[in-house]
UniProtKB/Swiss-Prot annotation:
Keyword Lipid metabolism: no
Family according to the record: Belongs to the CRK family.
Site (Proline switch): P237
GO cellular component: actin cytoskeleton; cytoplasm; cytosol; extracellular exosome; membrane; neuromuscular junction; nucleus; plasma membrane
Any single biological process term in GO: cellular response to nitric oxide
Official protein name in the record: Adapter molecule crk
Disordered: annotated segments: 61-85, 201-229
C-alpha cells in the first residue's frame, strides 16, 4: 500500500521535541505504517523517525551532517561556502526530510513502508497505571541502559511500573525516584508481602513471591526463565526458537531474517538486545524479543 500523505506538509508529521515514551504513546496500537518525525533527545541536531510496525513502535535515528536545516525550511539559500545539510538513515542519504519520507513511501523500513502521519488528535494519550494499581517488578539481570531514556538497574532491584507503552519496554521508577524505560525480559513480576509502597521500595523483600512475566498473559513474549541467568556462550552452543517473524530491511545485509519455529544458534548476546546468530546457514543480528531461549540442560526437547 502506497503512502497517502504530502511529505512537504511538515506540520502533519513533524512533532519537534517529543520523547520516545510520548512517541510510543501516540503510535502504539496504530496500524502499520503510521509514523511521526521528532527531534532526537540524545543527539542534538539529529531526528528520529518513529513508526508503528510489526505490532510495536520502532525508532530510526536520522543523522544530520553539516548545518541542520530549519523546520520548516527557510526559502533563503545557504550562505556561500556553507554546505547544505545531508540526512542519513541506515545506508541511505537524503537532502531533506521530505525526500527521505518519499523514499520510504515505497521502500520498507523493517516490515512496513510509511503510510500516513499519526493524527494530532492522539496527543496526550497513553496507558498510565493508577496509584491503586501500582505494579512492581524485580530485576533478573543487570541492565546498564543503552539510551538516555533507559533506566539502569542491578539484579535484585525492585522497580515500580509507571506505564506500559510497548510490549517489551515499560516505563519504571527505582528506589531513588529515577525513571526510565526497562526491557521486560530482564525482570519478573514482584508481589510484595506488605501493601505498603514505601516499605517495598528500598525495603526488605523477604517473603515476596515472584511470578514470571509470561504465564496467562496473551501474546508470544520472549521471556527468560525465572531466576535463570543469561547463558554463558563459553559453555557451548546456545539455541533459541523463533517466536516472531522478522523481515529485515533489504538494505541491511547484516540483519537476519526469521520465520516462526526456526532454530537459531546464538553466537553473541549483546546487552543492547541486538543478538547475533546463525539460521539456515546465514549469519546476522536480530532482536532478542523475536526468539525464546531453549532449555540449555535439555535442548533436544525443543528441537522438534
Amino acid at each position: 500500500m502506497a503512502g497517502n500523505f504530502d511529505s512537504e506538509e511538515r506540520s502533519s508529521w513533524y512533532w519537534g521535541r517529543l520523547s520516545r515514551q510520548e512517541a510510543v504513546a501516540l503510535l502504539q496500537g496504530q496500524r502499520h505504517g503510521v509514523f511521526l518525525v521528532r527531534d532526537s533527545s540524545t543527539s542534538p541536531g539529529d531526528y528520529v523517525l518513529s513508526v508503528s510496525e510489526n505490532s510495536r513502535v520502532s525508532h530510526y535515528i536520522i543523522n544530520s551532517s553539516g548545518p541542520r536545516p530549519p523546520v520548516p525550511p527557510s526559502p533563503a539559500q545557504p550562505p556561500p561556502g556553507v554546505s547544505p545539510s545531508r540526512l542519513r538513515i541506515g545506508d541511505q542519504e537524503f537532502d531533506s526530510l521530505p525526500a527521505l519520507l518519499e523514499f520510504y513511501k515505497i521502500h520498507y523500513l523493517d516490515t512496513t513502508t510509511l503510510i500516513e502521519p499519526v493524527s494530532r488528535s492522539r496527543q496526550g494519550s497513553g496507558v498510565i497505571l493508577r496509584q491503586e494499581e501500582a505494579e512492581y517488578v524485580r530485576a533478573l539481570f543487570d541492565f546498564n541502559g543503552n539510551d538516555e531514556e533507559d533506566l539502569p538497574f542491578k539484579k535484585g532491584d525492585i522497580l515500580r511500573i509507571r506505564d506500559k507503552p510497548e510490549e517489551q519496554w515499560w516505563n519504571a521508577e527505582d528506589s531513588e525516584g529515577k525513571r526510565g524505560m526497562i526491557p521486560v525480559p530482564y525482570v519478573e513480576k514482584y508481589r510484595p508481602a506488605s501493601a505498603s509502597v514505601s516499605a517495598l521500595i528500598g525495603g526488605n523483600q523477604e517473603g515476596s513471591h515472584p511470578q514470571p512475566l509470561g504465564g496467562p498473559e496473551p501474546g508470544p513474549y520472549a521471556q527468560p526463565s525465572v531466576n535463570t541467568p543469561l547463558p554463558n556462550l563459553q559453555n557451548g552452543p546456545i539455541y533459541a526458537r523463533v517466536i516472531q517473524k522478522r523481515v529485515p530491511n533489504a538494505y541491511d545485509k547484516t540483519a537476519l531474517a526469521l520465520e516462526v519455529g526456526e532454530l537459531v544458534k546464538v553466537t553473541k548476546i549483546n546487552v543492547s538486545g541486538q543478538w547475533e546468530g546463525e539460521c539456515n546457514g546465514k549469519r546476522g543480528h536480530f532482536p532478542f524479543t523475536h526468539v525464546r531461549l531453549l532449555d540449555q540442560q535439555n535442548p533436544d526437547e525443543d528441537f522438534s
